[in-house]
Amino acid sequence: MTQEILEDVNPTRMELLKLQDRIELAKKGHKLLKEKRDALIMEFFEMVKRASEIREQAVKKLMEAYSKLAAAKVTVGEIGVERASMATGEEIKVDVGSRNVMGVVVPIIERVSEDGGSKVVYGFADTSGALDEAMRAFTEAIDAVLELAEIEETLRLMAEEIERTKRRVNALEHIVIPRLENTEKYIEMKLDEQERENFVRLKRVKDLIERKKLKEELERVVEEGAELPSFE
């Protein structure tokens, strides 16, 4: 056979049964992986839409924050903004968790405050309302950027999983299953050959036995002096 088959295969009935089980299992696995691949692709494109919306929101919030910062600088001056910024002593802290999306572990990214809250409220008693508005706007912008980072990392991980699943589907479809099926045909061919050879061998043995019986019968007839049958 010119097709590729499994190495060191033993053409027996037992091996054929085992191979047929492997083919059935491989086909089931191929079907499940195709379903997983298709579901991942659908989920991926849904997330692409969401990522586009979140990206627009993040850009919008950043622009608003910088606009309000510019307004605050006009009100209290650049030095006043810097002093207020240093006075807060606030650091951005991020909590990174995880969740499962279609079998893919993806991150959950959240900004947290010292007391574990999910929001940090900026307030300055001796500063202008414009500066407070700028700080709140930057807080919202940071949240939007973190959300964008979360979904973009999720997209990256899902894209990798889609590629891995595609490779496994292609390997099963174009290499593993054809090789198993070619091996199945090879074993069936060998078993057919063995059956034909056994049939010929048995026929020869039968002919030999019949000839031996005929010879023994002729010898017995001769020894007994019996008359040989006439064929005239």
Curated annotation (Swiss-Prot):
* A GO molecular-function annotation: proton-transporting ATP synthase activity, rotational mechanism
Superkingdom field: Archaea
User: Which key words are in the record?
Assistant: ATP synthesis, Cell membrane, Hydrogen ion transport, Ion transport, Membrane, Transport
| One Pfam family cited in the UniProt record for this chain | ATP-synt_D
User: Gene3D superfamilies of this UniProt entry?
Assistant: 1.10.287.3240
* Membrane protein topology class: Peripheral membrane protein
Give the GO terms filed under biological process for this record.
proton motive force-driven plasma membrane ATP synthesis
Entry's localization field: Cell membrane
Q: Name one GO cellular component term.
A: plasma membrane
The main location class comes to membrane
Write out the similarity annotation: Belongs to the V-ATPase D subunit family.
Described purpose of this protein according to its UniProt entry: Component of the A-type ATP synthase that produces ATP from ADP in the presence of a proton gradient across the membrane.
HAMAP family xref list: ATP_synth_D_arch (MF_00271)
Q: How does it assemble?
A: Has multiple subunits with at least A(3), B(3), C, D, E, F, H, I and proteolipid K(x).
User: What is the designated name of this protein?
Assistant: A-type ATP synthase subunit D
Q: Which organism is it from?
A: Methanopyrus kandleri (strain AV19 / DSM 6324 / JCM 9639 / NBRC 100938)
